[in-house]
Structures are given as C-alpha cells and as structure tokens.
Amino acid sequence: MKYVIFVSDKNKFMDKILNISTVSDYNAYWGIEDRHPLVNVLEGSQITHPIRNCRKNFGLYVIFLKDVRCADYLKYGREEYDYQENTLVFVSPGQVFGYPEDGSTYQAKGWCLYFGPDLLRGTQLGRHIKDYTFFSYNVHEALHLSLQERETIIDCMKKIDEEIKNGTDKHSNTIIASAIELLLNYCDRFYDRQFITRKKANKDILTRFEELLDEYFTSWKPQRYGTPTVAYCADQLHLSPNYFGDLIKKETGKSAQEYVQGKIMDTAKDLLVLNQKSISEIAYALGYQYPQYFSRAFKKAVGCTPNEFRLRN
C-alpha cells in the first residue's frame, strides 16, 4: 500500500489517498490475513478494532453493503454523500472512495465484497463486467435495498465467503466468479425496481432533459461546443453518464444518444420549415462542424436530404 499526498494551498491541509492495488492491500488496511489472492468477503463484526479514516484509490472492484445510516459524510471522488442504511455502493478500479483522513476512526459495520480484475479473466463475468453499468454510477445513485433484497445480497456474499473458505483448486475462480455474477444480476434486478419506484423523479429528470436540450439549441453553445453529448447532459443534470443513460433507456426505450439525436433532427425539421436559412447555416446552428455531416445524419434519420424535406414541406 502506498499513500499519495495532495496539499491544498487554500485550505492548508493534506489530503492523503491510500492506493489499494490488490486484495492483499485491502486486507492489510482492515488488519486481516489473506485467504485468497484475488477476492475476499468481509463482515463488519469480524473487525473488532477501530479503523482509521482515509480516502482510497482502488485497483479493485468493491461492493459495500451498509447496515446503518452513517453519521458523517462519505466522499466519493469530489462528491460528498450521507447515505441511508441498507445501501449498496459500487466502486470500480481507478475510483477514489472513502472519508477524508482527519485522525478519526470508525467501527466497521455491514458487508464488503472486493475482488481484483484478474479473478475475472477468461470467465463469463470477465467478458460482460462492463455491462454492469452501476459500477460507474455516482455514489448518490446508490442502490437502496428492501429488507428482503438485503437478505438476498447477504446470502450471495455468504456463498462466496464459503467458497473462499473451501480453499483454492482449479475450479475455485470460476465458481467464485459465477457467484459474483449471480450477485450482480440480482443488483441489476433491484436497480430496475428502484427505477420503477422512482418513476416520478425519473419523469422530472426527463422533463429537465428536454428543457436542457431546448435551451441548448436556442443558445450560442452549438456553435462553440458542437452537438450536445450524453456526458454534457448528464453533467448538467448532476448524474453520472451511465446512470443517466440507463434511466433514459428505461423511461423512453431509447438510448440517451438516440434521444439526443432525435431531438437534433426534430429541431432541424423545425428550422428547415420555419425559416429560410441555408442548409449550411442550419447545420452550424445545430452544432455540426461540416454541413455534409448534418446532411448525412439527417438522411439516415429521416430518409431524405434536408433540401428534399424542405421542398416537401
């Protein structure tokens, strides 16, 4: 384990970030022995000593199940978040997560599953791990479990823990990876439930998305920044791109990119019919750097060229 230290001139404090590159590194942080080189399951009651707070840069996949509401805030990247009990938080390699180091300690509670990317190599899960987009959600987009869902997740973690206890043989990694995949599939199901139960909030986001696109195309932004990207829209709505994309897909049946492209084409149709600007002027107004790119995209989406559409309408 190594520390990376950042010093803030403004606040005059040192922000230490602990690099957790391996399962062994994280075991050492908890003060426990290695059981398997690539994976571990930890239940909070196993840790009887206080743990120091610090932010951690993970080279692992980590899933936290918190049993209690946190009294303090959690820092995830640059975001601060106070989360509820029975919350699942997902961290993927390269993400920074944890409480800033201030000399305080805490008592471990809940469950934690962590595993290295090497565990997945050559497995079904390794080929599809990127399909579990919630590993890239922001922390305020965490999964909030019902009591029954919580028991399902704990049961999955116990099965993984039991396999680790059985010792390592040629089948171990495949069996453990399959058990992790089952857990992640349950998480996918539970996120679908969460999207449904938060339908009103999701509709509000969809309305704000529409308003954002309307405002974008009536401003100077297309000429300066080009056509709006999914990442830009997600950032303006204070959502991670993956969570935003999944939400739009579940609400509309279209990907966020398809939705943006549809909005561009609808705006283009209005401009073609309602004013006398040239095709090039309309292309630039929509954020296209080259008019031929606009014409090509329009024909692909609408089935005719912009000029043909104008003549028909």
Regions found by a protein language model. Name each.
Residues 1-82:
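Generic protein-terminus/edge-of-domain signal
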Residues 8, 102-166:
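A hydrophobic/aromatic-rich effector-binding and dimerization subdomain
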Residues 83-97, 114-117:
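Conserved metal-binding segment of the jelly-roll/cupin
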Residues 86, 244, 293-294, 298:
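Short hydrophobic/aromatic patch on the recognition helix
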Residues 151-214:
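An amphipathic alpha-helical interaction segment
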Residues 177, 199-237, 258-277:
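A short, Lys/Arg-enriched amphipathic alpha-helix from helix-turn-helix/homeodomain DNA-binding modules
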Residues 250-289, 311-313:
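Terminal helix-turn-helix DNA-binding modules in bacterial transcription factors
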Residues 295-313:
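…primarily DNA-binding HTH/wHTH and HhH modules…
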